[in-house]
Each structure stands twice: as structure tokens, then as C-alpha cells.
A protein has these predicted regions:
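Exposed, low-structure sequence patches enriched in small/polar residues
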Residues: 1-173
């Protein structure tokens, strides 16, 4: 219905590398955005923040956060937030551990949707991975991951839980 393109849009971003160990990134966006779920044009405001830091020689941390709001004249269609944290620690050149936590949280106004939607929805995922380099071509992994949700109809529940061991070899011709 003619809602395929955005007409007015403003975006501003800033990146700074404070020193060899810290980087920050900020992006702000506002303007028209297509609401594909309801085939209409809305107004979006979004903010994305990212901060990376290396502590000492072996610890790396990544923090990210994104906020997004879509509005129409009748009200706020949704507020969405995504948070991401990753940590990496090198015990030695051959052994390291990585952990990730990601949280997704959205609040919708169901009365502003054509189809039935949940008003509140939240999910969280975690991963933990231990990696050991046996030689330049062979890696061994021990990992754990899980994923959980919570919404208007369910209490917090873990859906997927995985524990795995893997050996990877890079064949050379």
C-alpha cells in the first residue's frame, strides 16, 4: 500500500577509540519506519550503544544495548530492548573460555496490531564455551547453552538446554 520506503530519516553515529584497550560506539536514529506487521508507516526512535574493553592482556569484555520505539498517532506500537554481554578470557595461547548473555525484551500494545500478539515478551540466552587448541589444525570444544522465555501467558521457562563436546580439524590439501 505504498509503505515500502522511508521518507524522512535522520541518523547520527559516533565512534571513539579512547586508547588501545577501549572503544565506544553510539548510534541514534529517528524518522519514518515501515511497520511491516500492520502495513503502515510509523515513527521510529532508536539508540544503540556499544563498549569494548580489554582488561589486562587476557580479558576482553563487550557490552551492547539497543533501544527502539515505534509510534503511530494512536500510540506506541512497541518498545524493544536488546542487551548483549560477551566476555573472553585467555588462560594461555591455547586455552580460553567465552561467555555470552543476551536479553531480548519487547512491550507491545496489542490493540494497535491487526493480528493477535503478546503484550510483553522476554527471552534470555546464555552460552559458555571452553576451547583448547590441540595443535594449529585441531581444536577441542566443551560448551553449554540455554534459552528461556517469558510472556503474558507463561512464567519464565527454559526451553533449550545443551551440553556438547566437539573436536574440529582443519584438513589441508
Amino acid at each position: 500500500d505504498g509503505n515500502e520506503s522511508c521518507k524522512n530519516r535522520f541518523e547520527c553515529q559516533f565512534t571513539s577509540r579512547f586508547n588501545r584497550t577501549m572503544t565506544a560506539f553510539i548510534r541514534f536514529e529517528t524518522g519514518d519506519k515501515v511497520d511491516y506487521a500492520n502495513d503502515r508507516l510509523g515513527d521510529e526512535t532508536a539508540l544503540h550503544l556499544q563498549y569494548d574493553v580489554r582488561l589486562w592482556r587476557r580479558l576482553f569484555l563487550w557490552l551492547e544495548g539497543s533501544l527502539e520505539r515505534l509510534t503511530i498517532p494512536e500510540g506506541t506500537v512497541y518498545d524493544a530492548r536488546v542487551y548483549y554481554f560477551r566476555a573472553l578470557y585467555h588462560f594461555t595461547n591455547a586455552l580460553y573460555v567465552r561467555g555470552i548473555v543476551q536479553l531480548y525484551d519487547v512491550e507491545r500494545d496489542p490493540s494497535l496490531y491487526q493480528d493477535e500478539v503478546m503484550g510483553n515478551e522476554r527471552s534470555i540466552g546464555t552460552q559458555l564455551l571452553l576451547t583448547y587448541k590441540l595443535n594449529p589444525f585441531t581444536l577441542a570444544y566443551l560448551g553449554y547453552s540455554d534459552f528461556g522465555i517469558e510472556d503474558d501467558l507463561t512464567d519464565p521457562v527454559t526451553l533449550n538446554r545443551t551440553l556438547f563436546v566437539k573436536v574440529s580439524y582443519a584438513f589441508r590439501p
